[in-house]
Amino acid sequence: MPEVEVGILSPAEVSFRCHGLEFARARLSAKPGNFRSAPEIVFGAAPSERVLDGGNFAHFERLIRSIGEVRHAEGPGESRWWRLHPERWLESLVVKNICALDDQLDPRWCYSQVPAFSASDRAMIDVLVSNREGRLAVVELKADEDIHLPLQAVDYWSRVASHHARGEFQKFGYFAGRELSPQNRS
């Protein structure tokens, strides 16, 4: 597989993706009956995930090979691996080259799948990025037409403005060392 994206999900879990399609995760897992954890690899696409062991290593190799053979721009559109999660594929391309959308966006401060809360509701922003002046930009990606996009954009922007006004992005490790513009604050 030529291009593997590695994403940190938590201090104990790392994701492996091909053009946005997660095919494996490495994690520390608690062992039953004690407080110790042990590393394990989980592979497959939900809901068909399984823990890697000696009995299914060949299946893991076949999965990686088959995804790598079809998940690229010229791949066969009828393949399930090619069609799966088109918005994640688009997101992976945008994050790799955020300046293709706008040359004022700063690739050093580009984050994907950023949680945004409002009361008890949790949403995931596809891409949150700072421009060169420190102003925040929300990028919401759609693989298909969506009549709700304008309302979703307003909702996400209000969430981002609220988090920014309270300094929560830096508090949770986003934009570390980057001074964000106060113009974003409501």
Residue positions per predicted region:
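Charged, terminal alpha-helix-loop-beta segments
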Residues: M1-S186
